[in-house]
């Protein structure tokens, strides 16, 4: 009943398109889908309406339908082709390698017929299965070891990789199993006797036979082997031929006789009765029948040449005993013309270097048509416009070669469709698409995203911090496009470079290896290289400039006032008659920072007389705010704080000791008048010092008197000369001894410890090499002359002044060239903003120029108008090489002038020396 219904269905599938062809001119096109078997009902195969070029809105009017309604139907809402029934590949196609359902699709208004092919792919849904639940064997006990027994093979409805692969049995001492392959490729088990049997010892054996397929995961089936040991039968059946051969058309009807096999047995009785059976039962029983008594073989199904061109059947003849014989039957199937060409890639390389030459072979292609004659002659061509072409090498062989230039950066992949067409009527064709990947070569150098890089880094950065990142790109792939970074060059020393910066080879991040110091290094430049990993490698360079920003990490440092060589504080003398605004001294401080961080301000923290002195906010100049009163103490103390402009500000303090006196003699009693405990040794030292001072004063007075008389008689001198003794009086503000050597040839410092029971005088005498040929002190007749302790003879040669060389004009500066300082500003204490570009060498040059002017006699001690007015303490010994930017802080101790001498102008006084008032006080003391 079922067979009749299937036959009727197949008949309708044949008649339906035939009848439709009466109304349609021809099938317009063929649509092909591929699905796995056993899809659930309602599963989507594809959008049939879209593939037919129909819109969803047209479906109701076009009445789209298919002929294979048992398996598929069409959704009129979406146009999808849906599964309508169980699709079992094994049931539909059996053991055919390629299984497809072909049916027609019909549309109306207008009527069209389309041919649809749905390829059914096999899945591993069938486990190997033995037909019989058990296998019975009778083996004579006389069988010798090495005898083989062919067993019934298992059936596996799946094909190719999911089909049957091997057999196994449980371990035992008498038998082993091997898997054999028949000429048609099917596998069957063969039992091998390993050890002689003994019926009296064991009359039967039970084994478990397992068949496994090649699926993933593999499926298996088992059966039992019952072996009964019998008595000996000494003759086995013998076939008339070992191999039977026959040819058969592929479309013969069922039941067609193929041939008869025959075997004979010389035994008699039951041992001579022969029965025939197939060994490879899955193929045999599906397509062929074997009469067990006569040996006649007939067809039992449809033979297809394209599925199998040759069948090999294994036939077993068994007598009434235990002996068997085997033969093979080879059936050749005659072909008919019903196959399209097939394209096979014999050799194929889908990775093509982009620099490949024209004519390079990419693939070797073999075309095959299972048909013969004209229907089997095939031609191939490429459908797309691609830089490739096909060249015929021999019959049925083509090679795919490069026909144009390749550039991976423009096109990385090509899809090439090869169409093969036979010469049949009508012609059949097939197409195969391949994807060709263009492999990269290193033909592009890295490119930085910027032409150059500039980064700003604050000083005192943490070591190891990232300060910049450079980035370069390379359009190549893999190692050819993998960029690594390195430092190629720098304006730093090679040894210093490793301790300053490093760069990450992978990310291009530049790291600081140490904390930067703006005062030591303000900027540096690196040359970074980006290099790919190709062979040969390509690279690119870029410059990275690192600017180190300043932080307020240096507190101001007070240069003046400073402690004496023995640690004692220095004193500055102020005339008792000093008027308000008189320049007493100047606090000189420096700050190693720059910019706003080096802009210094001066503040009075503590004063013994708060209203007696004023302090310039930016200049550091200490001036008298009012005249000295009767109730004011002669000794004054100022505690000054110097702050910079940083955030937060840093500061330093300095203590000024000021004494109101008109001469040195007035200072000594005041200095020594302290309620200290009496010490005989100290008092003795004090008297010795006082005696020495008195002797020196008397000697100096005599020398000054002699020189004054001599100067009156000398009219050739432009200025009044000074004596060439080893000491001269300086009653102005004292400076540290290490700053006393300079352009002035005669100076001494009075250093008295303010908190000591001793009164000490420290004299700094000139060496003969430093003695100038002319007195550099200005024409002040009231100058107090001090006698030298080393030489009581005054050796003065007037001719020296006439041979004094004029100063080099290269060292002179015009008023515009001289740098402005805080003292050159107007009366407000706002100061000037420090210039960060101030050059230390220019300051040194100005100091030397001042020294040259002083030696020439054209400059006063305090500095006249248009001169620099630098004190001797800022001579070559104190060059301020450590001060990069302190113009506002340059002050000439003992003078009321700064670099531009504008302070004197602001006070409305002549630009005379800072010691002028003090010298007049000395003159009064002399009188």
From Swiss-Prot:
Coiled-coil segments on the chain, per record: none
Basic residues: compositionally biased ranges: 917-927
N-terminal signal peptide: 1-28
A GO term, aspect molecular function: calcium ion binding
Highest taxon of source: Eukaryota
One Pfam family hit: Cadherin_C_2
Function: Potential calcium-dependent cell-adhesion protein. May be involved in the establishment and maintenance of specific neuronal connections in the brain.
Identification of the protein by name: Protocadherin gamma-B1
High-level lineage: Eukaryota, Metazoa, Chordata, Craniata, Vertebrata
Gene: PCDHGB1
């Amino acid at each position: 009943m079922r067979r009749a219904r299937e036959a009727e269905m197949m008949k309708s599938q044949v008649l339906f398109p035939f009848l439709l062809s009466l109304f349609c001119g021809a099938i317009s096109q063929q649509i092909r889908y591929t699905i796995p078997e056993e899809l659930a009902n309602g599963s989507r195969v594809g959008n049939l309406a879209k593939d037919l070029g129909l819109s969803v809105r047209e479906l109701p009017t076009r009445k789209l339908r298919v002929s294979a309604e048992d398996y598929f139907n069409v959704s009129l809402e979406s146009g999808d082709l849906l599964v309508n029934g169980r699709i079992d590949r094994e049931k539909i196609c059996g053991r055919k390698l390629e299984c497809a359902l072909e049916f027609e699709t019909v549309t109306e208004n207008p009527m069209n017929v389309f041919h649809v092919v749905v390829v059914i792919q096999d899945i591993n849904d069938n486990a190997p299965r033995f037909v019989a639940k058990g296998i019975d064997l009778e083996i004579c006990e006389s069988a010798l070891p090495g005898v083989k027994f062919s067993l019934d093979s298992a059936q596996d409805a799946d094909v190719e990789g999911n089909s049957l692969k091997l057999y196994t049995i449980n371990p035992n001492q008498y038998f082993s199993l091997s898997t054999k392959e028949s000429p048609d490729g099917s596998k069957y088990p063969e039992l091998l006797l390993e050890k002689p049997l003994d019926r009296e010892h064991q009359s039967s054996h039970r084994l478990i036979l397992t068949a496994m397929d090649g699926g993933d995961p593999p499926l298996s089936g088992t059966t039992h082997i019952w072996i009964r040991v019998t008595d000996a039968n000494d003759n086995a059946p013998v076939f008339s031929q070992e191999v039977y051969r026959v040819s058969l058309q592929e479309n013969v009807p069922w039941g067609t006789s193929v041939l008869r096999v025959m075997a004979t047995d010389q035994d008699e009785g039951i041992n001579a009765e022969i029965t025939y059976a197939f060994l490879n039962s899955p193929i045999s029983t599906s397509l062929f029948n074997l009469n067990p008594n006569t040996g006649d073989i007939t067809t039992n199904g449809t033979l297809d040449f394209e599925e199998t061109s040759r069948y090999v059947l294994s036939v077993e003849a068994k007598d009434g005993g235990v002996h068997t014989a085997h033969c093979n039957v080879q059936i050749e199937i005659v072909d008919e013309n019903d196959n399209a060409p097939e394209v096979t890639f014999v050799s194929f390389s889908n990775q093509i270097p982009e620099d490949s030459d024209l004519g390079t072979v990419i693939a070797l292609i073999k075309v095959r048509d299972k048909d013969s004659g004209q229907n089997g002659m095939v031609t191939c061509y490429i459908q797309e416009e691609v830089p490739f072409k096909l060249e015929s090498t021999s019959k049925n062989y083509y090679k795919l070669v490069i026909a144009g230039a390749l550039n991976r950066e423009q096109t990385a992949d090509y899809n090439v469709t090869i169409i093969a067409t036979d010469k049949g009527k009508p012609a059949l064709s097939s197409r195969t698409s391949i994807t060709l990947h263009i492999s990269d070569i290193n033909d592009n150098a890295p490119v930085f995203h910027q032409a150059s890089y500039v980064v700003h880094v604050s000083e005192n950065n943490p070591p190891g911090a990232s300060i910049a990142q450079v980035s370069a790109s390379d359009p190549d792939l893999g190692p050819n496009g993998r960029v690594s970074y390195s430092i190629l060059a720098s304006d730093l020393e090679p040894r210093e470079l490793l301790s300053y910066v490093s760069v990450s080879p992978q990310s291009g991040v530049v790291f600081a290896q140490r904390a930067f110091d703006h005062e030591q290094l303000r900027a540096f430049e690196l040359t970074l290289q980006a290099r790919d990993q190709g062979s040969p490698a390509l690279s690119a360079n870029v410059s990275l400039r690192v600017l180190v920003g300043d932080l307020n990490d240096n507190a101001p440092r007070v240069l003046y006032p400073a402690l004496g060589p023995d640690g004692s504080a220095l004193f500055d003398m102020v005339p008792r008659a000093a008027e308000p605004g008189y320049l007493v001294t100047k606090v000189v401080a420096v700050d190693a920072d720059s910019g706003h961080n080096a802009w210094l301000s001066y503040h009075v923290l503590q004063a013994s007389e708060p209203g007696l002195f004023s302090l310039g906010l930016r200049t550091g100049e200490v001036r008298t705010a009012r005249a000295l009163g009767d109730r004011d103490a002669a000794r004054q103390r100022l505690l000054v704080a110097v702050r910079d402009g940083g955030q937060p500000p840093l500061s330093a303090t300095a203590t000024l000791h000021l004494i109101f006196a008109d001469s040195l003699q007035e200072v000594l009693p005041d200095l020594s008048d302290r309620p200290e405990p009496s010490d005989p040794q100290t008092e003795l030292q004090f008297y010795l010092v006082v005696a020495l001072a008195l002797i020196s004063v008397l000697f100096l007075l005599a020398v000054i008197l002699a020189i004054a008389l001599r100067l009156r008689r000398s009219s050739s001198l432009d200025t009044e000369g000074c004596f060439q003794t080893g000491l001269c009086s300086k009653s102005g503000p004292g400076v540290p001894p290490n700053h006393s050597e300079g352009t002035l040839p005669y100076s001494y410092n009075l250093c008295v410890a303010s908190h000591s029971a001793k009164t000490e005088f420290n004299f700094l005498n000139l060496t003969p090499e430093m003695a100038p040929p002319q007195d550099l002190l200005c024409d002040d007749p009231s100058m107090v002359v001090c006698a030298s302790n080393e030489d009581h003879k005054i050796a003065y040669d007037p001719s020296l002044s006439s041979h004094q060389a004029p100063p080099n004009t290269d060292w002179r500066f015009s008023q515009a060239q001289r740098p402005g300082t805080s003292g050159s500003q107007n009366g407000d204490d706002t100061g000037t903003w420090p210039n960060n570009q101030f050059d230390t060498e220019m300051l040194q040059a100005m100091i030397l120029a001042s020294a040259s002017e002083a030696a020439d006699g054209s400059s006063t001690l305090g500095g006249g108008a248009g001169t620099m007015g630098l004190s001797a303490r800022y001579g070559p010994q104190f060059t301020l090489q450590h001060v990069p930017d302190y113009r506002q802080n340059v002050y000439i101790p003992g003078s009321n002038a700064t670099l531009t001498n504008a302070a004197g102008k602001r006070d409305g006084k002549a630009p005379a020396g800072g010691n002028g008032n003090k010298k007049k006080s000395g003159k009064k003391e002399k009188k």
